[in-house]
């Protein structure tokens, strides 16, 4: 097994296979569930809009992969600063049966020097998730924050408020995951000493096995080569799957989405 095929195999098992499009349908979500089960192994999770969760749960169970987790999104994609709405959406996602919730941090508020609303939003969502044993990922939207100091601050606030994961991006803005932002975020996890409990998720723009391998190498370098597993690292992606399967010698159905 070459280094690239090893990285591809690793990346496949860490994927949150995603469809978050306005034109998503029951048929598209069903197809996504089928794709999450491949000849090369299963993805860690799928990530879909909340209304599709009951359908996905049924499809995953019927195809014999109930262990594939279901993630969804709240306060998405704009990251507004209304805590009550973000919390209500998160509670609704939990009621739909989500295993994981990816909530968008109110990043514009932070850019306007309001640190408190982000802390309070993440904390409120964490309380709701913890009661239901649901994992909370916080999307800080690095491509909009841009500045290293803001990316660092959003990461710190999210972790201090109880995030189980910090995630780069919604995939809905011009700049999504980058190695530079990934380095900042993982260094925060490392420097805060929370690597046991807090994971990292690059999302959007990771489309090839080569790109995935770069993120995995960076994680191994910063966090140590025993850290990366599905509890501590995920890729948010859709088109990546087809490339990974090709790299592994399996011609898979490719996603049309460009997340």
Curated annotation (Swiss-Prot):
Chief localization: cytoplasm
Xref: InterPro entries: Aldolase_TIM, DeoC, DeoC/FbaB/LacD_aldolase, DeoC_typeII
Molecular functions per Gene Ontology: deoxyribose-phosphate aldolase activity
Cellular component GO terms held in the UniProt record: cytoplasm
Name by which UniProt lists this protein: Deoxyribose-phosphate aldolase
Keyword Lyase among UniProt keywords: yes
Active-site positions on this chain: 102 (proton donor/acceptor), 167 (schiff-base intermediate with acetaldehyde), 201 (proton donor/acceptor)
Keywords: Cytoplasm, Lyase, Schiff base
GO biological process annotation, one example: 2-deoxyribose 1-phosphate catabolic process
Key word Cytoplasm present: yes
Compartments where located: Cytoplasm
Domain of life: Bacteria
């Amino acid at each position: 097994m070459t280094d690239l095929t090893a990285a591809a195999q690793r990346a496949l098992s860490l994927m949150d296979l995603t469809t978050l499009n306005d034109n998503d349908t029951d048929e598209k979500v069903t197809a996504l569930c089928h794709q999450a089960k491949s000849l090369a192994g299963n993805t860690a999770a799928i990530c879909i809009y909340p209304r599709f969760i009951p359908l996905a749960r049924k499809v995953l169970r019927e195809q014999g992969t109930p262990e594939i987790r279901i993630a969804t999104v709240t306060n998405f994609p704009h990251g507004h600063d209304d805590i009550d709405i973000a919390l209500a959406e998160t509670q609704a996602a939990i009621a739909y049966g989500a295993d994981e919730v990816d909530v968008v941090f109110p990043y514009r508020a932070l850019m306007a020097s309001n640190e408190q609303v982000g802390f309070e939003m993440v904390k409120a969502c964490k309380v709701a998730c913890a009661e239901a044993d649901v994992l909370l990922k916080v999307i800080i939207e690095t491509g909009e924050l841009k500045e290293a100091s803001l990316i660092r601050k959003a990461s710190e606030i999210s972790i201090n408020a109880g995030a189980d994961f910090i995630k780069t991006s919604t995939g809905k803005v011009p700049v999504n995951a980058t190695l530079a932002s990934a380095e900042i975020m993982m260094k925060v996890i490392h420097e805060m000493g929370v690597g046991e409990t807090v994971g990292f998720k690059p999302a959007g723009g990771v489309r090839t096995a080569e790109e995935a391998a770069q993120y995995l190498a960076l994680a191994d370098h910063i966090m140590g080569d025993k850290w990366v597993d599905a509890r501590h690292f995920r890729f948010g992606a859709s088109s990546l799957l087809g490339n990974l399967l090709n790299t592994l010698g399996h011609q898979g159905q490719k996603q049309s989405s460009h997340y």
